[in-house]
Structures are given as structure tokens and as C-alpha cells.
Swiss-Prot record:
Top-level EC class: transferase
Function: Catalyzes the ATP-dependent phosphorylation of fructoselysine to fructoselysine 6-phosphate. May function in a fructoselysine degradation pathway that allows S.flexneri to grow on fructoselysine or psicoselysine.
InterPro entries (UniProt xref): Carb_kinase_PfkB-like (IPR052700), Carboh/pur_kinase_PfkB_CS (IPR002173), PfkB_dom (IPR011611), Ribokinase-like (IPR029056)
Protein name: Fructoselysine 6-kinase
Organism expressing this protein natively: Shigella flexneri
Disulfide-linked positions: none
Length: 261
């Protein structure tokens, strides 16, 4: 079996201030960051038949991701305008392009059979795949980002081994939410807290991980890096706190340069 495949969103992040464009998106980023740990992840996503689509596929292949199921569709590749304010990213206009109609084919499902872990995020139009993937014995992971009001918290979590999210800081309200998520059926919930580290609830106890002290250049990809480091650590047999520490180290590396990768 192969370690991990991601499904769903891709996006070209366009930085007008830098006059540069970087390939990204949660599914793409997590796959790329997993290559840091010596594995070849797979990725299922849709790109347009434009220059950005060509760039994204070339970038993924260069980084060591299996692009056999990065499908090219007629239309525009997803893209986001990004500005930097005090080294933090601020998202501007977003064009979803061909990703608006994303769905897995039967052939995509068959291809995923070779992977142990499948990950997606809330923007990827991939949530409908998770009941089938979980029932097939895949370890499933999903990133809700900061969308705490999403109805997917009610419907999707019984099909998740790991539910990831983000919040500004830990407080009692957050801890209660995390307990409720696991009670609803998720295996473990992990919340990244930016400069405040991360916290996990596994149904028995809370686990906390402090951030690594580094010079921040660009926070793009920090959360995706954490997820990749965590999942690769878990698949290698790490404990929950060990996997959180590896996720933190992966994120610390990413935030020290411009762009996701």
C-alpha cells in the first residue's frame, strides 16, 4: 500500500506585490509537503487547460507527486489573489474555475484503493467521497479550516479518523466544541492555533503542542504543512503528541519563505 492521497482543491496563488504566482491549494499543498518524508503521494484534482493548469501539473511532478489523476478540464484553473500585510497573507478575489464541478469518477475511486490515507479539505468538493472511503477501511482526514459553522461538522465527522480545524486560541468554548466533535463520531480532532501552537482531543485527553520559534516570512501553507507532517508521522507509527510535534516542525519550515512551497 502507498501512504497518502489527497483529493479536491488546487489553486494558483497570485501575489501582485511580488509579481509572482505559486501553485497551491490544500490538497496540492498537503501532497507536496508529504514528499518531505520520503513518500510519493497521489493527488486527484482538476485543473484548467490554461497556462496555470500546465504550471500546476509541472510543479507537482517536479516535487515528486503522482499526477496521473490530476485531470485537465476545459476552462480556467482556480486562482486566488494574495496580498502580504506584515508578513501575513490576506486573500483577495478568488476564481474557482473548473474546480466548481469537481467530482470523483469510478476510476478515481479504484485508483485510491492503493492508498492507506485519504485527505481533503472543505473547499475541495470532495466530502461526498468520505463515507465510501471510510467504509472501505481508509484512514480519513479532513480539514475544516476556520469554518466552524459548516453543516459538514454534523454530517461528515462520523466518517473521519482525523478532523482538522483552525482557531485563534484555546478557550473553554473551543474545548467543548472539540469534545462534541469526537462524541459525534470523529476519531480525533486537531486544531491549529497559529502562534499559539495546536491542541488535540482524542476522546480521552487533550494534547498540546507549542509552536517552534522561527522568523516568519509568509504564513501561506502553514496549516497544510502541519497536516502533512502529522499524517506522515501517524502513518509511520508515531504517537499523537509525536505526530503533532512533526506537524509543527513541518509548518515551521514552510513559514520561513514566500509561497506555500
Amino acid at each position: 500500500m502507498k501512504t497518502l492521497a489527497t483529493i479536491g482543491d488546487n489553486c494558483v496563488d497570485i501575489y501582485p506585490q511580488l509579481n509572482k504566482a505559486f501553485s497551491g491549494g490544500n490538497a496540492v499543498n498537503v501532497a507536496v509537503y508529504c514528499t518531505r518524508y520520503g513518500i510519493q503521494p497521489g493527488c486527484i484534482t482538476w485543473v484548467g487547460d490554461d497556462d496555470y493548469g500546465t504550471k500546476l501539473k509541472q510543479d507537482l511532478a517536479r516535487m515528486g507527486v503522482d499526477i496521473s489523476h490530476v485531470h485537465t478540464k476545459h476552462g480556467v484553473t482556480a486562482q486566488t489573489q494574495v496580498e502580504l500585510h506584515d508578513n501575513d497573507r490576506v486573500f483577495g478575489d478568488y476564481t474557482e474555475g473548473v474546480m466548481a464541478d469537481f467530482a470523483l469518477s469510478e476510476e478515481d475511486y479504484a485508483w485510491l484503493a492503493q492508498y492507506d490515507i485519504v485527505h481533503a479539505a472543505i473547499w475541495g468538493h470532495a466530502e461526498d467521497a468520505f463515507p465510501q472511503l471510510h467504509a472501505a477501511g481508509k484512514l480519513t482526514a479532513f480539514d475544516f479550516s476556520d469554518k466552524w459553522d459548516s453543516p459538514l461538522w454534523q454530517t461528515l465527522v462520523p466518517h473521519l479518523d482525523f478532523a482538522f480545524a483552525s482557531a485563534p486560541q484555546e478557550d473553554e468554548a473551543l474545548r467543548l466544541k472539540m469534545k462534541a466533535i469526537v462524541a459525534r463520531g470523529a476519531g480525533t480532532v486537531i486544531v491549529t492555533l497559529g502562534e499559539n501552537g495546536s491542541i488535540a482531543w482524542d476522546g480521552a485527553q487533550f494534547w498540546r503542542q507549542a509552536p517552534e520559534p522561527v522568523t516568519v516570512i509568509d504564513t501561506m501553507g502553514a496549516g497544510d504543512s502541519f497536516i502533512a507532517g502529522f499524517l506522515c508521522g501517524w502513518s509511520a507509527g508515531m504517537t499523537l503528541p509525536q505526530a503533532m510535534a512533526q506537524g509543527t516542525a513541518c509548518a515551521a519550515k514552510t513559514i520561513q519563505y514566500h509561497g506555500a512551497w
